[in-house]
Amino acid sequence: MATATGKIVAVNGNMITVAFTGAVAQNEVGYAVLGDKKLMAEIVRVRGSRCDMQVFDATTDLMVDDRVEFTGELLAAELGPGMLAQVYDGLQNPLADLAKEASKISKDAEFFLQRGMYLSGLPRDRKWDFHPLAKVGDRVTAGDFLG
């Protein structure tokens, strides 16, 4: 759900300048809408009712007046079981899974990252064994082994 919206007023390489309505914050994630694709970007500077955003995909075909949707969430990485078995890109997309999904679109797609394609960083369809060593109410500190 978009918390704020905006329109692109300038494109320069992988940077876009956006005039927005609503509240936004530095490091907030937004998406530049390009047809049926949404290109992930992060706010790197806010100046009044405009912000500069770094787009994490090719900005080819983005134009002035294209729509931008802001998420109200900061750029973050998800932590949990299964991370050590994956190879990720800078947005925590698991590259092997991304290639598999992309190859469904085009045979050539498995060699190149597809614009606007993002996957969950951790597998949601797996169960992980966890044997807790700490109990509810135990006082824990940094470095404690919980299980």
Question: How would you name each of these model-derived features?
Answer:
Residues 1-147:
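Peripheral, non-AAA+ core regions of ATP-driven protein-machinery
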